Amino acid sequence: MEAVVNSDVFLTSNAGLKSSYTNQTLSLVDEDHIHTSDKSLSCSVCNSLSQIVDDDFISAGARNQRTKPKRAGNNQSQQPIKKDCMVSIDEVASTHDWSTRLRNDGNAIAKYLTTNKYDTSQFTIQDMLNIMNKLNIVRTNRNELFQLLTHVKSTLNNASVSVKCTHPLVLIHSRASPRIGDQLKELDKIYSPSNHHILLSTTRFQSMHFTDMSSSQDLSFIYRKPETNYYIHPILMALFGIKLPALENAYVHGDTYSLIQQLYEFRKVKSYNYMLLVNRLTEDNPIVITGVSDLISTEIQRANMHTMIRKAIMNIIMGIFYCNDDDAVDPHLMKIIHTGCSQVMTDEEQILASILSIVGFRPTLVSVARPINGISYDMKLQAAPYIVVNPMKMITTSDSPISINSKDIYSMAFDGNSGRVVFAPPNIGYGRCSGVTHIDPLGTNVMGSAVHSPVIVNGAMMFYVERRQNKNMFGGECYTGFRSLIDDTPIDVSPEIMLNGIMYRLKSAVCYKLGDQFFDCGSSDIFLKGHYTILFTENGPWMYDLSVFNPGARNARLMRALKNQYKKLSMDSDDGFYEWLNGDGSVFAASKQQMLMNHVANFDDDLLTMEEAMSMISRHCCILIYAQDYDQYISARHITELF
């Protein structure tokens, strides 16, 4: 296929305003079973509810919250609704002040489309810009196009947020079955109002005063208790050990359970749930959970997992990195089936995709070529939760490595074999791979055409690097015991990316653990032994390494902690370290060793230099997370409202 060189390809790409969401694989509600907090061998939802009942988030007495009386719906709302109808959510949703004007602009554009009978199946960004000029809508921030397009997509019916009635949240709001009310009444008994309110308030209060793990450096980090075997997964640490724009709004400020309550009871959807609501209503594909056969049960399990992850976030900020068997969220995440991806995922991609899908988080909008009828292609805007990088399908040399930087970031393609957006710079031969539809949308002068960037990002941009070999021949390590071979092809990872005039910094990275190469230079192991996370905090790169099960790793960790302590005493000098260790530092070394034997560490123990961190990330990274500074992300929205 001949490559298309078109500097305006982003503006002329199909925006996909018509929702392709369909949920025909599951029934509406289980007519024969109501989920309770009783443990059951045959119902995974009941088991997860029983764990929520056992949780105690309160260390002191608290007055129970009184639930507000429900507004009775009319008789028509109790009748089944046709699948093709649209339902208005505008009257039940409120917004933050900074999003009100953006929402009104989206409503005006949607009204113009319906009044003039536009063909929304061929709608492009250029069409939206033309309409904005006619309506005198001025949006100077290019990244606002991401959310403005989302609002237009979800407001095409009577200028109000709307989706097809097959969406489970809309079915809950319209009370499509009396059994939905019976199930939610049981949930009200299970979710203690006081406990759940305390959990929400605690995590939101923590968020106000949290930047990254350096904010908790006055605490001792506890990695394990004698009676526990589970721990906070490194991917959870990468996502929530540092405050990420947009994801923080959806996961910490938003809450799936209270959103379901507000929709069913015809109450105003609170402003903190609004972005969660919009993310969910505009998702492209539903998720299916193994062992759950109906839509309402899927939403309940989704709310349960959101609550479990919220508790994990609370523990992360408090320096508690272990968890009981009942609190482990990893097994639940592995049971999610992603209907939009047509191939088996690795464990890391499965966990990352599952965490993001619970709140419908898709922060990247990319212009890609989508095949049509197998003989041609059409340019379409594709929302993606993360971008896939596959070194094993790329032809690289020492002069032309895989580079993730401000220049190559504009090269994306669509992999028709898996249904994912992939990172495909034209100089590495990815375009010749089967299933990948590749074009060069910006021509030869990439930086000169940055104003027509085919990528816009809402706060954060994530990359998943496929390094596992033979991943389609075996299942995950946690179920088969097979150890994958890891491709350690070095990647030139830039600490900063300039995208659309906004600086995105590398905030965190998840890496494969193949041994302790940094401390044992003779190690040549290529087998996967686990994962670790590197967070780029205000005090420098910090490593989250679960080394409590390996004596060699514990010794390496002790040496790192001792060197960090000596550098603080000697003004970052390494000279005389071993003399200090045998002399004045012997008492500190003994106390630090005792702490690590008890699985307790301090923040300063695991600090790295920037050179060490980038060297480890280059060869072993599997997840990279770039993001704006959170304060700049929020303040930009408030400043926009002033104009």
UniProtKB/Swiss-Prot annotation:
Residue stretch(es) of the prosequence: 1-61
Q: Does the keyword Nucleotide-binding apply?
A: no
* Places the protein is found: Virion
* Signal peptide coordinates: none
Q: How is it modified after translation?
A: The 73-kDa precursor is cleaved to a mature protein of 60 kDa during virion maturation. Proteolytic cleavage of major core proteins OPG129, OPG136, and OPG098, which occurs at a late stage of core formation, is required for production of infectious mature virions (MV).
The organism sits in which domain of life? Viruses
Q: According to its UniProt record, where is this protein mainly located? A: virion
Its GO CC terms? virion component
Q: Which UniProt keywords apply?
A: Virion
Question: What InterPro entries does the record tag this protein with?
Answer: P4B
The task this protein performs is described as: Major component of the virion core that undergoes proteolytic processing during the immature virion (IV) to mature virion (MV) transition. Essential for the formation of a structurally normal core.
For this chain, the family text in UniProt reads:
Belongs to the orthopoxvirus OPG129 family.
Q: Any idea what this protein is called?
A: Major core protein OPG129
